[in-house]
Amino acid sequence: MAFFSTQPPYMNPVIPFTGIIQGGLQNGLQITLQGTVHPFPNRIAVNFQTGFSGNDIAFHFNPRFEEGGYVVCNTKQNGKWGPEERKMQMPFQKGMPFELCFLVQRSEFKVMVNKNFFVQYSHRVPYHLVDTISVSGCLHLSFINFQNSTAAPVQPVFSTMQFSQPVQFPRMPKGRKQRTQGFQPALQAPVAQTIIHTVHSIPGQMLSTPGIPPMAYPTPAYTIPFFTSIPNGFYPSKSINISGVVLPDAKRFHINLRCGGDIAFHLNPRFNEKVVVRNTQINNSWGPEERSLPGRMPFNRGQSFSVWILCEGHCFKVAVDGQHICEYYHRLKNLPDINTLEVAGDIQLTHVQT
């Protein structure tokens, strides 16, 4: 099944966020949220509702991190909650990026988290009454994207990526109903990425090209080498995101977090050696390299990538395509002075968020 854009995405929405779903919910509509959970979260809520009052919520999706972590699903009608459906499993990790997808079908919502089927929730009220999405809680959002299998197709003119195009939801066998406790085991699903060109978008702004899906921008949004400031530098819980495509004949590229003339953190994938080098440069002198990784080389020639760097009090944490790959202990301790991002080498940049 092919999916196509139905409305421009909301970029970098400020939490709590409430926005209109153009045309309301429709059968086949998929809503994708990509973001990062705060390091010390309490709760997250995604509501599909009628209007902005919050009195009528068709689907309340509510991860709660207390008591070992679980997810509550519910419906509110005329200001009154119905019976809860709980899944005693937490699909989100503290301080880590996530991709959350909701697929609207005639009888239920299906929910995927990080490419895995998580739960389905049967409609208690007509879904076509829903015209608003609201998001709140302990998270940062990069975007909310809307796509549908019934919209007119637009031919992509740019490369696809690996992290956030509509996923293929598993089908329930006919005659079987989903249980409210335990639900179903997670199932792997293939995913491809939308390329979103944005440079420090206005929070909550919608892109102005509804006729072209996010992956269809033909012009590179960034020049290499790329430099930009990091407002207020780093501090615990501060994170940045860099997405791009590795060139087919790439030898290496690097991401530098700079502190004046020094490099506090140098992240340097080298394709001939199949390693990712980490280091610090102080007064033009490099320190000892760190090369070990728990798994294989996470970057590949000719393929897309998404790098997320989270600052904590003692280290930087790095995830590639949603998978944690390493920690790098701070060698330069004055985190607010680390205020410049540099990206260079054999890649094309598609998205930077600082």
Curated annotation (Swiss-Prot):
A GO CC term attached to the entry: extracellular space
Gene3D superfamilies membership: 2.60.120.200
A Pfam family of this chain: Gal-bind_lectin
Induction: By viral mimic polyinosinic:polycytidylic acid (poly I:C) and lipopolysaccharides (LPS) in microglia.
Annotated GO MF terms: carbohydrate binding; disaccharide binding; enzyme binding; galactoside binding; oligosaccharide binding; protein serine/threonine kinase activator activity; receptor ligand activity; signaling receptor binding
Principal place of residence: cytoplasm
Key words of the record: Cytoplasm, Immunity, Ion transport, Lectin, Nucleus, Repeat, Secreted, Transport
Localisation: Cytoplasm; Nucleus; Secreted
SUPFAM superfamilies: Concanavalin A-like lectins/glucanases
Residues where a beta-D-galactoside 2 binds: 266, 270, 280, 286-292
GO BP: any one term: receptor clustering
Tissue: The isoform Long is expressed exclusively in the small intestine.
Additional comment: The LGALS9-like proteins are encoded by a duplicated regions on chromosome 17; there are at least 3 genes coding for galectin-9-like proteins.
Domain notes: Contains two homologous but distinct carbohydrate-binding domains.
Function noted in UniProt: Binds galactosides. Has high affinity for the Forssman pentasaccharide. Ligand for HAVCR2/TIM3. Binding to HAVCR2 induces T-helper type 1 lymphocyte (Th1) death. Also stimulates bactericidal activity in infected macrophages by causing macrophage activation and IL1B secretion which restricts intracellular bacterial growth. Ligand for P4HB; the interaction retains P4HB at the cell surface of Th2 T helper cells, increasing disulfide reductase activity at the plasma membrane, altering the plasma membrane redox state and enhancing cell migration.
Protein name, as recorded: Galectin-9
Organism placement in taxonomy: Eukaryota, Metazoa, Chordata, Craniata, Vertebrata
Gene that encodes it: Lgals9
